[in-house]
């Protein structure tokens, strides 16, 4: 119940539900963590702190508990305090990308030059133009037909509750497994870009991203997002998979305000003057 209330934006009701559950069941790691997460969402960071500590002490191998406590330390202006927990998280899952995102942020906030080593934007960020699939006279014609088909897949009218989409819709399932010829043609062009990207990456056996470079790859997730007026993505990290990419199929006329540009480096933690956009790319 509390999870549904929280997903629907009923934070106060969800807090009351969890407090009632604690009174009935007693203190558990799960309930204390959930209550702490909701209090942190409301900005009551001091109240969330001991609840997260209790959860971690009760279940020290729970990565979610550790990561949320790391986030709390950063929000409270003490990024250096979180390094021990980051080390613990990496010991549990050495390649967890959310953990590395926090590590990079802590390095940046504490002035550690390892941030530039981890986030080498000039090396890791690339933009490509998709090749024209066979049977199409131009890329614009292909994109027009693909956009029309993708729009037909957006049968839901509300934004997903547990995703980064704000004022838009997202398709369900794995898009690139759709057998429609347009989707498969797009997948072929996309794979050409991925292949080019991987060929350009340097070899580095100790870097958490480059050390996972392999001979082949598979797509672990894919979807279509259709944004409405003023629609956007909230800042987020992809914790699963290894490499992320996005393709812009149809975009409105661009203004001079950088509206719709994809940003890198800025967090969702509302860090005020500590926020920083490292790079932005126009679709």
List the model feature ranges, each with a label.
Residues 177-191, 195-283:
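Catalytic core of non-heme Fe(II) oxygenases with the double-stranded beta-helix
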Residues 117-211, 232:
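Non-heme Fe(II)/2-oxoglutarate
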Residues 26-27, 60, 93-95:
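Short coil turns that delineate tetratricopeptide repeat
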């Amino acid at each position: 119940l509390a999870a549904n209330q929280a997903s629907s934006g009923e934070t106060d009701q969800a807090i009351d539900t969890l407090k009632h559950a604690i009174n009935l069941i007693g203190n558990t790691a799960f309930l204390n963590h959930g209550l702490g997460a909701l209090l942190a969402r409301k900005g009551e960071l001091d109240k969330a702190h001991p609840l997260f500590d209790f959860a971690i002490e009760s279940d020290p191998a729970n990565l979610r508990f550790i990561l949320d406590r790391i986030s709390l330390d950063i929000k409270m202006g003490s990024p250096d305090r979180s390094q021990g927990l980051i080390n613990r998280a990496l010991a549990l899952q050495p390649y967890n990308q959310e953990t590395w995102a926090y590590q990079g942020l802590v390095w940046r906030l504490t002035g550690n030059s390892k941030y530039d080593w981890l986030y080498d934007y000039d090396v890791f960020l690339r933009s490509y133009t998709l090749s024209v699939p066979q049977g199409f006279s131009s890329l614009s014609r292909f994109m027009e037909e693909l956009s029309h088909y993708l729009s037909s897949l957006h049968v839901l009218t509300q934004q997903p509750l547990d995703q980064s989409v704000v004022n838009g819709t997202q398709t369900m399932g794995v898009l690139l497994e759709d057998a429609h010829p347009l989707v498969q043609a797009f997948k072929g062009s996309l794979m050409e870009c991925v292949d080019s990207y991987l060929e350009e990456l340097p070899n580095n056996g100790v870097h958490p991203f480059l050390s996972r470079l392999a001979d082949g790859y598979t797509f672990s997730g894919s979807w279509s997002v259709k944004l409405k007026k003023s629609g956007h993505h909230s800042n987020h990290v992809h914790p699963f998979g290894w490499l992320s990419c996005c393709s812009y199929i149809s975009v409105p006329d661009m203004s001079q305000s950088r509206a719709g540009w994809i940003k890198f480096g800025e967090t969702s933690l509302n860090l005020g003057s500590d926020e920083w956009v490292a790079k932005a790319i126009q679709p």
